């Protein structure tokens, strides 16, 4: 197997494994729009990375984490509804990123690769970044699984039981930010949340427990990655969108199957 294809497969599979349980929380807590806002802000992180001459991956990670903290702070202090606030920040950060990039005449940037991913162009450094970020998020999810689940099921009861609800909510948002940052190279900023939401939504119909849903979402994500890479290899289609198309097909198939 060619090195670039092996790197793409390892990166895609690692992201699919972590997107399963994390995407389940996104679906349960109806945080899809939050994920969209962070993914749009990732392009601003890319632009600032080039402007400040730092690694785009590092700039995107710092940018997504900073925006997640800003969102939580604004939600607590502003009278605006959450969806209104997200609706303002999502297009604003994406547009600002595009404007900043337009001023960089001396920097050659493949904008399509950042918007829709360039999985087959992953380098050794990119792979290490993706594997490390995915492993960290999986480890933290394993540690925080029960408390996060308790907060998701009933926040008031979790608060009565002494769980740090605000801290856990912030932790979940930061984990989403990390995954979005590492996933940008795979499916691009415009398609990142689809890899979080679609497998989890497909698994939700047929799972009998939260753990079953998380595992099912991971397996569906792995299937979508393998199918998307195969389509890209044999039909010369873009890898990121091909993965999302395969995930969408799996979701449609889940609708056709009887609900458990």
How does the language model describe each region?
Residues 6-7, 78, 86-146, 174:
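Transmembrane helix-bundle core of multi-pass membrane transporters
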Residues 1-17:
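Membrane-interfacial amphipathic/re-entrant helices at transmembrane-helix boundaries
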Residues 8, 56-64, 83-87, 131, ...:
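Loop-to-transmembrane alpha-helix initiation sites
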Residues 41-51, 89-101, 121, 165-177, ...:
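Small-residue-rich segments of transmembrane alpha-helices in multi-pass membrane proteins
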Residues 1, 115, 119-120, 220-257:
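C-terminal binding/interaction regions
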Residues 24-107, 203-216, 232-235, 258-259:
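Short loop segments and helix-boundary regions at transmembrane helix junctions
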Residues 127-199:
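Helix-loop-helix "hairpin" substructures at the membrane interface of multi-pass membrane proteins
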Residues 190-241:
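Transmembrane alpha-helical segments in multi-pass inner-membrane proteins
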